[in-house]
């Protein structure tokens, strides 16, 4: 990174982060902050989630993972190396935050553990950055000079969450925050601290990582159609079933954690679930794919999201078909929009027959404007304006 680039980044700060687990999977807050890692001192706090666990394989694995990591503080998922200037803090916590006594115990544990880490690192002055609603219980307890909220989702509408509890948490979080960013225009309109402007900060992309180059298509061979990312209730399974049944020769590949029922999809011989793939290995795995698809159910939750994977798919330089959510429709000149199964099927047929878009313009735009470094610079500039 050039010295000119460095000058625009936040530097020489002590920062507490409340977000998803460090290095567990490629999430937006970690992507955003990664360009700032070398220039600041960090305490990264891993708390429990806001959803009460259920008796499922996924949740049991998460519980085991959490228990294991409590005893190995600097070990991350997939063994990712943690820089020396980042201290990972994993307070001992109990799920079921909806119960007042447990919530108070968790707050005590977090404050005690983080306080010790701050003292050990000699961090007397700090700022906090957070992207999860339950951070409301902890921010402001560490005498921060600035409290920064990066809102990445409408968490209160997530399936399985306690709407009232999460809504109250986020209302308190917004009230405590000095600076608020939102990753979509719809979130920007609804997330305000009542004191200052909420800034639009859309997701970036690690462009070079995903720019795998074009691939020639053949009408004589089955298409390899790909979805990678978290597969959950937001994913439109009807679209996938209709593609699989209408185009039985084409092969659909799904990479990522699955956290919803997929019983109906597993009946199709041309739908393949491969499980999660480490972020570093994704380019190699997806290099054989012809088309990337983002099929979403349309509802209040998805209308608020800005899919993190969208720009990653576009950066491949290969055809992308996606449900026309508001943040996706903004890229209508760079991809194929599909509002139902028939749209997706017709686009796939047209692409196989030779239809194409000017991907070079897309790639040039993403490389020049949408990298995570560019996002980190904007993020830094707004913070620097407000630091004492």
Report residues per predicted region:
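Conserved donor-binding/catalytic core segment of Leloir-type glycosyltransferases
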Residues: 218-235, 240-244, 253-255
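Nucleotide-activated donor-binding/catalytic signature segment of Leloir-type glycosyltransferases, i.e.
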Residues: 261-283
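Acidic anion/phosphate-binding donor-loop and adjacent secondary structure
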Residues: 157-163, 192, 205-221, 263, ...
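Nucleotide-sugar-dependent
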Residues: 235, 280-285, 292-315, 322-333
């Amino acid at each position: 990174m050039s010295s000119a680039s460095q000058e625009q980044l936040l530097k020489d700060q002590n920062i507490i982060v409340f977000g998803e687990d460090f290095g567990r999977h490629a999430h937006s807050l970690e992507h955003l902050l990664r360009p700032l890692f070398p220039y600041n001192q960090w305490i990264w706090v891993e708390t429990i989630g806001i959803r009460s666990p259920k008796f499922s394989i996924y949740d049991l694995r998460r519980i085991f993972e959490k228990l294991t990591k409590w005893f190995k503080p600097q070990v991350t998922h997939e063994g990712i190396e943690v820089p020396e200037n980042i201290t990972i803090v994993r307070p001992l916590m109990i799920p079921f935050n909806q119960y007042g006594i447990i919530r108070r115990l968790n707050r005590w544990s977090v404050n005690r553990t983080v306080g010790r880490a701050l003292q050990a690192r000699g961090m007397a002055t700090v700022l906090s950055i957070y992207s999860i609603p339950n951070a409301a219980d902890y921010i402001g307890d560490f005498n921060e000079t600035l409290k920064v909220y990066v809102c990445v989702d409408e968490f209160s509408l997530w399936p399985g969450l306690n709407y009232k509890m999460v809504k109250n948490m986020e209302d308190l979080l917004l009230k405590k925050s000095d600076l608020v960013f939102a990753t979509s225009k719809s979130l920007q309109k609804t997330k305000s601290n009542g004191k200052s402007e909420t800034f639009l900060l859309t997701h970036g992309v690690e462009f070079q990582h995903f720019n795998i180059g074009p691939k020639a298509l053949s009408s004589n061979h089955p298409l390899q159609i790909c979805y990678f990312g978290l597969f959950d209730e937001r994913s439109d399974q009807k679209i996938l079933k209709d593609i699989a049944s209408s185009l039985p020769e084409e092969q659909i590949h799904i990479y990522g954690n699955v956290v919803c029922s997929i019983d109906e999809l597993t009946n199709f011989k041309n739908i393949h679930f491969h499980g999660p793939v480490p972020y570093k290995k994704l380019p190699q795995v997806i290099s054989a794919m012809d088309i990337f698809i983002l099929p979403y159910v349309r509802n209040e939750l998805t209308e608020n999201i800005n899919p993190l994977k969208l720009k990653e798919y576009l950066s491949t330089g290969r055809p992308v078909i996606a449900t026309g959510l508001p943040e996706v429709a903004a890229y209508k000149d760079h991809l194929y929009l599909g509002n139902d199964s028939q749209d997706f099927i017709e686009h796939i047929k047209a692409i196989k027959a030779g239809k194409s878009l000017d991907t070079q313009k897309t790639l040039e735009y993403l490389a020049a404007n949408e990298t995570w470094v560019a996002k980190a610079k904007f993020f830094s500039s707004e913070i620097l304006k407000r630091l004492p």
